[in-house]
């Protein structure tokens, strides 16, 4: 049966928990609809994450929405994630509205700000609904968080405001899937329960015949269909929204010697997707090293980006990394600093306005001769140019409040369209840059691996891995979900009728 979608047809995906599979399911649905010839866009009203992406217009959105835009064949846009919260402390976040920071807020102040945030959410959604045939919306966390229900703009508060149907997804791999689904329904209001039109069970591995009695019970108990059961997709690569993947894929038997790369898992690490290309490269053994673990020997040490650079630098020192880095350099190892990690390499970091914590200054590691001052206006841009190493092509994006200056910058790491950027030490052992996504460009990745000591790096393109991941999820969505029901929900014809789940009579 073919479907015609009205402009702005909307379906929302909510989850019983964080990491239930909302982002992945939205990505798969977006690609499936795009393949069917529909003009579709992703939307997440509110996101809390330190992994972000820069749009071509110079705005900031959650990384997951940038991947979902790719699934739709679109460039990312700030309307796809109008509210982004970037935690800089346990009880405070930088609030980004339609791509641009409006200030730091604690939970109480943000609660008071929510009506303004909701206005931005509805404004962005209205623009997407006007431009596209379909909008696939991703919720945040769980809709059943009792303490967050008042003034909710991320889950049912949004669904009720725009009057859209909802599918509820739960992760069976972590256990308790039926309790999660039934319990979530029990904690919703009557109108919210009615809005949930079906369930998706995610990450199933096993015998469907053993699961089927549970599905039948769930449908009888709730009166709602199981729209489908998605399998656990081993080895799937999609950019993580916030969870840090700590190490590389296991090496294949008989594989070449691998370059050893380590990075501290900073408490406020940001944009750790920078490391995905290293984590997935077949010749790289990459590991994040957490609290309490001494830094092991490595060929390359990378200091990641941070949302609280001075606080993370203090943590780095307390964890013994400063001495370990100096020993690493003394024995000929390479050191790379990315964004906040680059700032740590200098002589000092100044935060006179208290943008990332109490106002003040902190001494840097003193490995490069420059200083950084954090300023109110954040630098947001996509960039391209060449890496000084081998003249390799480089592209990526910048997200930082720091402005750096000093003699070390006279020997840059990159030459970008807008000018020289970053720093390379006189002895060539230390490289620092503000460019995120540095390893995503195959030429730059190859040059950096060779610089770090890998004689013959294989060409590797993480962007192709991402595209394959999107296609895998879309194929699973098409094969395992009741797409007829989903299309009915989008077109409006299925809002009040019952439907059989995928694979069910």
Curated annotation (Swiss-Prot):
An annotated Gene Ontology molecular function: ABC-type vitamin B12 transporter activity
Q: Name one GO biological process term.
A: cobalamin biosynthetic process
Q: Which PROSITE patterns match?
A: GATASE_COBBQ
Pathway annotation: Cofactor biosynthesis; adenosylcobalamin biosynthesis
Q: Which residues form the active site?
A: 339, 436
- GATase cobBQ-type domain boundaries: 258-444
| One Pfam family hit | CbiA
Q: Which UniProt keywords apply?
A: Cobalamin biosynthesis, Glutamine amidotransferase
> What does the function comment of this entry state?
Catalyzes amidations at positions B, D, E, and G on adenosylcobyrinic A,C-diamide. NH(2) groups are provided by glutamine, and one molecule of ATP is hydrogenolyzed for each amidation.
Q: Which family does it belong to?
A: Belongs to the CobB/CobQ family. CobQ subfamily.
- Tell me which PANTHER family the record gives: COBYRIC ACID SYNTHASE, DETHIOBIOTIN SYNTHETASE
> What name does the UniProt record give this protein?
Cobyric acid synthase
Q: Which organism is it from?
A: Methylococcus capsulatus (strain ATCC 33009 / NCIMB 11132 / Bath)
List the lineage, top down: Bacteria, Pseudomonadati, Pseudomonadota, Gammaproteobacteria, Methylococcales
């Amino acid at each position: 049966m073919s479907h015609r979608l009205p402009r702005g047809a909307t379906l929302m995906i909510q989850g019983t928990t964080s990491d239930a599979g909302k982002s992945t399911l939205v990505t798969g649905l977006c690609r499936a609809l795009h393949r069917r010839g529909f003009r579709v866009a992703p939307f997440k009203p509110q996101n809390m994450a330190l992994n972000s992406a820069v749009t071509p217009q110079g705005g900031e959105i959650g990384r997951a929405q940038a991947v979902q835009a790719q699934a739709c064949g679109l460039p990312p846009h700030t309307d796809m994630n109008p509210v982004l919260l970037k935690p800089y402390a346990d009880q405070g976040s930088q609030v980004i509205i339609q791509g641009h920071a409006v200030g730091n807020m604690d939970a109480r102040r943000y609660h008071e700000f929510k009506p303004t945030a909701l206005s931005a959410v509805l404004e962005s959604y209205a623009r997407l609904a006007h431009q596209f045939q379909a909008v696939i919306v991703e919720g945040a966390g769980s809709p059943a968080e009792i303490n967050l229900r008042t003034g909710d703009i991320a889950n049912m508060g949004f669904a009720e405001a725009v009057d859209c149907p909802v599918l509820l997804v739960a992760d069976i791999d972590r256990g308790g899937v039926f309790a999660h689904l039934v319990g979530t329904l029990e904690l919703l209001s009557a109108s919210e329960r009615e809005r949930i039109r079906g369930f998706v069970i995610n990450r199933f591995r096993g015998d469907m015949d053993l699961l089927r009695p549970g599905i039948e019970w769930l449908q009888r108990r709730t009166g709602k269909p199981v729209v489908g059961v998605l399998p656990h997709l081993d080895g799937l690569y999609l950019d993580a929204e916030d969870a840090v993947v700590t190490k590389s894929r296991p090496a294949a038997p008989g594989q070449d010697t691998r370059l050893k790369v380590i990075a501290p898992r900073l408490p406020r690490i940001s944009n750790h997707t920078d490391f995905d290309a290293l984590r997935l490269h077949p010749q790289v053994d990459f590991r994040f090293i957490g609290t309490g673990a001494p830094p092991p020997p490595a060929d390359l040490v990378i200091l990641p980006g941070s949302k609280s650079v001075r606080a993370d630098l203090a943590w780095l020192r307390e964890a013994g990394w400063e001495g370990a880095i100096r020993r690493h350099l003394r024995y000929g190892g390479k050191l790379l600093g990315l964004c906040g990690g680059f700032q740590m390499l200098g002589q000092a970091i100044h935060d006179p306005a208290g943008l990332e914590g109490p106002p003040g200054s902190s001494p840097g590691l003193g490995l490069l001769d420059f200083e950084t001052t954090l300023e109110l206006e954040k630098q947001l841009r996509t960039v391209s140019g060449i890496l000084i190493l081998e003249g390799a092509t480089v592209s990526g994006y910048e997200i930082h409040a720091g402005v750096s200056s000093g003699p070390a910058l006279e020997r840059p790491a990159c030459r970008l369209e807008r000018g020289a950027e970053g720093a390379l030490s006189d002895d060539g052992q230390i490289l620092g840059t503000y460019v995120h996504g540095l390893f995503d460009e195959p030429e730059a990745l190859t040059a950096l691996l060779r610089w770090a000591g890998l004689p013959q790096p294989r060409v590797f393109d993480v962007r192709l891995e991402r595209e394959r991941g999107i296609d895998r999820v879309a194929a699973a969505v098409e094969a395992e979900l009741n797409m007829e029901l989903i299309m009915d929900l989008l077109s409006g014809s299925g809002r009040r009728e019952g439907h059989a789940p995928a694979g069910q009579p």
